[in-house]
Amino acid sequence: MFQGNQAINMDAKGRMAIPAMHRDALASACGGRIVMTAHTEDRCILIYPEPEWQEILPKIEALPTFNKAALRAQRLLLGYACAMELDSNGRVLVPPTLRNYANLDKKLMLVGMGKKFELWSEESWWASVADLDVDEELPAEMLSLSL
């Protein structure tokens, strides 16, 4: 559903405007209701349409709490989760706790990741892209894909 990346700005009040190319899809998929939370591996924010979040929430809650990595993931995903709604201009407030977690300032990158978005500081996004290891071995799940 969501793909591509787009440079966007955050205003002084901590709001960002969802690009028009995604606004209609969000309106029809969830009435503009989204959930923002911390990414478990990178200093960026995950943005889910609310119905998509409701599908993965039971899976997050079912993670074993005696497993340190699973508990860390729960703390990040559930502890930072914020239900938000786009305003009539397609803007949404990025909560201060998440802005701090992802080191967000005015310049942002919104990255479509299929059923969700990632929101990065522009600087962190380009550093992450530059750090990609093209020689890294593909996961086994991708070896059968024909692109």
Curated annotation (Swiss-Prot):
GO molecular function, one term: DNA-binding transcription factor activity
Gene3D superfamilies tied to this protein: Transcriptional regulator MraZ domain
Pfam families: MraZ (PF02381)
Coiled coil: none
Main location: cytoplasm
Keyword annotations from UniProtKB, A to Z: Cytoplasm, DNA-binding, Repeat, Transcription, Transcription regulation
GO CC field: cytoplasm; nucleoid
Locations listed in the record: Cytoplasm, Nucleoid
A GO BP annotation: negative regulation of DNA-templated transcription initiation
Domain named SpoVT-AbrB: residues: 5-52, 81-124
NCBIfam families reported for this sequence: division/cell wall cluster transcriptional repressor MraZ
PANTHER family named in the record: TRANSCRIPTIONAL REGULATOR MRAZ
Quaternary structure annotation from Swiss-Prot or TrEMBL: Forms oligomers.
Similarity-based family: Belongs to the MraZ family.
Protein name from the UniProt record: Transcriptional regulator MraZ
Native source organism of the sequence: Teredinibacter turnerae (strain ATCC 39867 / T7901)
